[in-house]
């Protein structure tokens, strides 16, 4: 069996060039292929597949803009090492109308949100290739202060574990601390308070888990993450409009302003500063810049004749490391996650690399790479995620592989993403009681209520009204609902418009419902 396994491995590895399924001979008989079976897709590409698909992108983009109402969109395609399409649609900021300098073009800079994870993965791949770290390097070797709730996991958890979301940390652990304005180190320190699922066999998507791994790589390099990324990836690729620093994004004149979806309209109401989780969600870039990165990934780590990432270090990132979307029936294909990349198999039996990015406050992004077709596409929007970039790239991938669009992708993705806009809180949709119970004197609620995880909550009184402060960002009036129950409204990345916070006082205790999902929402005076 060992000999057989070795032979099969050799068969798979003997030729890694993109190949097509054999086409029938002139006599109509099938032509047998000598390409290793794992490299053969289920069907050949249509003639002129990429050119024909590119020719339809303008109409696809226009249609999706009309259906969704998103303010701005930019799209680019790389094929054969060249940019074959790059164009913008719509506007950067709806307040400025259709002025020429407000129109989106291929150089307009967007926030990429979680597409940043894939870019960060290639930064790490560079470092792995020069033997600065390994995907299997334990994080505590570089960050001695880092800890999770299980000492054994703390000792073993590696850079690769955190880049593949298999550390056992809960889904989006730490994100709500970021919403409150805490800095990166504070959030990473609090990861030790999180309960863990089984190590290396559980998948749960975490921004700050990945960020901790990136921080370890940066410390190992002796420079901040944003500087490391500049030095080993962005500058060598000539990505002059790309940065991990939110300040750089804000300083650019040609930037797309984020728009949030409120009451059926998109409005530029909020600013999303992702610096605390920059390796996971902080990149800003244009589609023209992103074509350089896509070309590098398609070329197995090389760009313009220069090796950016060692192919052996890049390969683990773009191949499955854990099942992220298990099949629900035998005939279904499972989805996988590599190191910072979604990895799957299309219905044409082609490997597909992808990632989406989503900021509720105003960014929706996606890229798709089909290595066997030597093509990649990226789509960026400046609006609450609605499925537009995913639908556009999926339609393009269908056209490349089949010559036609085979699903109503916008309907599928729009339905999938709709829950992101759902307000949170048990009092949402309820009317205040007609005859509320009287509350205690306002002064009796005043004070500082302590919580080891969320930090101190400060309740103050001004002109007979109560105010709540928590972290650096939450500062809201408290409105009496009934008795010792008060409410507040606050919009953040994880608290969409219409959400209602519930604050319940009980002597020297204050329970904030929004922060109590896992039982940690009680503060003590």
Predicted segment positions?
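Short, conserved catalytic-motif segment at the N-terminal edge
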Residues: 47-110, 129-134, 141, 149, ...
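Short, small/polar residue-rich loop motifs at catalytic or cofactor-binding pockets
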Residues: 69-72, 361-364, 453
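C-terminal motif of bacterial Sec signal peptides marking the signal peptidase cleavage site
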Residues: 10-13
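Bacterial lipoprotein signal-peptidase II cleavage site
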Residues: 15-22
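Short, well-ordered beta-strand elements
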Residues: 365-382, 511-513
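Bacterial N-terminal signal peptides that target proteins for export
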Residues: 1-2
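Short, surface-exposed loop or secondary-structure junction motifs
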Residues: 89-93, 151-361, 365-366
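Peripheral terminal and inter-domain segments
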Residues: 15, 394-525
């Amino acid at each position: 069996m060992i000999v057989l396994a070795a032979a099969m491995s050799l068969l798979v590895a003997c030729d890694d060039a993109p190949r097509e399924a054999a086409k029938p001979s002139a006599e109509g008989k099938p032509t047998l292929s000598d390409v290793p079976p794992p490299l053969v897709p289920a069907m050949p590409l249509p003639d002129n597949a990429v050119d024909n698909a590119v020719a339809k992108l303008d109409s696809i983009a226009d249609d999706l803009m009309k259906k969704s109402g998103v303010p701005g969109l930019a799209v680019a395609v790389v094929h054969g090492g060249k940019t074959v399409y790059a164009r913008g649609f719509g506007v950067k900021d709806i307040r400025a109308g259709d002025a020429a300098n407000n129109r989106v073009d291929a150089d307009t800079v967007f926030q990429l949100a979680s597409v940043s994870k894939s870019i960060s993965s290639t930064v790490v791949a560079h470092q792995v290739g020069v033997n600065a770290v390994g995907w299997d390097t334990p994080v505590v070797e570089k960050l001695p202060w880092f800890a999770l709730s299980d000492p054994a996991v703390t000792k073993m958890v590696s850079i690769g574990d955190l880049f593949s979301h298999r550390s056992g940390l809960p889904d989006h652990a730490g994100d709500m601390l970021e919403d409150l304005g805490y800095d990166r180190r504070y959030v990473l320190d609090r990861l030790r308070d999180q309960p863990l699922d089984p190590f290396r066999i559980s998948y749960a998507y975490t921004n700050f888990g990945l960020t901790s791994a990136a921080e370890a790589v940066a410390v190992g390099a002796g420079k901040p993450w944003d500087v490391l990324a500049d030095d080993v990836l962005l500058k060598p690729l000539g990505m002059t409009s790309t940065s991990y620093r939110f300040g750089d994004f804000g300083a650019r004149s040609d930037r797309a302003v984020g728009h949030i979806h409120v009451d059926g309209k998109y409005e530029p109401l909020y600013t999303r500063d992702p610096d605390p989780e920059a390796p996971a969600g902080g990149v800003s870039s244009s589609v023209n810049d992103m074509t350089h990165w896509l070309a590098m990934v398609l070329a197995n780590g090389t760009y313009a004749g220069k090796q950016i990432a060692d192919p052996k270090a890049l390969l683990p990132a773009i191949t499955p490391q854990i099942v992220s979307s298990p099949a629900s029936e035998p005939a279904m294909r499972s989805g996988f996650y590599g190191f910072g990349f979604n990895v799957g198999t299309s219905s044409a039996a082609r490997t597909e690399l992808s990632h989406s990015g989503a900021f509720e406050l105003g960014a929706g992004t996606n890229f798709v790479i089909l290595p066997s077709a030597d093509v990649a596409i990226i789509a960026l929007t400046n609006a609450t995620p609605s499925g537009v970039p995913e639908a556009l790239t999926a339609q393009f991938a269908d056209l490349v592989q089949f010559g036609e669009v085979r699903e109503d992708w916008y309907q599928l993705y729009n339905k999938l993403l709709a829950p992101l806009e759902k307000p949170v809180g048990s009092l949402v949709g309820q009317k205040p009681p007609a005859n509320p119970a009287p509350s205690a004197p306002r002064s009796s609620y005043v004070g500082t209520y302590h919580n080891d995880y969320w930090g101190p909550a400060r309740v103050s009184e001004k002109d007979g009204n109560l105010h709540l402060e928590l972290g650096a960002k939450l500062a809201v009036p408290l409105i009496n609902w009934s008795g010792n129950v008060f409410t507040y409204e606050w919009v953040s990345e994880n608290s969409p418009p219409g959400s209602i916070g519930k604050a319940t006082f009980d002597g020297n205790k204050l329970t904030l419902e929004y922060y109590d999902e896992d039982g940690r929402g009680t503060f003590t005076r």
